[in-house]
Amino acid sequence: MAAIYDALFIFMPIVVLIGLIIVWSYFSPKRVVIYEYERGVVFHNGKFHRILVPGAYWLLQRFDTLQRVDVRARFITIPGQEVLTADNINVKVSIAASFQVNDPLKALTITSNYSESLYMILQLGLRDLFSSSPVEELLAKRGELSKRLFETTVEKVSNIGLTLPIALLSPRT
């Protein structure tokens, strides 16, 4: 009987230690670093929890999911779009735009890919702008077209969490 107690004294701490290691690995926190040029969006069990600003954080890896969002200014170009004017004349135009993520939560949750959404918003804004005017009017107000495109798309872009500081049109031959 004494041999059984001796075995328990030897193996019981090992079993407890193994159990603690298993529990610790299940609930262990994970250290993450958010850099100056990004923001982190934390979802706890699939629901929005908080936005992380630059710094170091501890997250529970079993319950928390981190999505990183780059908030640096980026550029997008839409080359050579052929657009019909109101008088059915084809015009080839390119767009160059600068954008930046303003609201990381909106950028992640409202659309599946905010870059593609921006591309589509600019493309549709361009088509709306050109299809509503005849070619003579477009040529007469050439300098104003970029401003009008910017005005028509800026609100739609802000709805998906982006800011659009610049949207420029350039005619193509």
Write out the residue ranges for each language-model feature.
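N-terminal hydrophobic membrane-entry segments
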Residues: 1-173
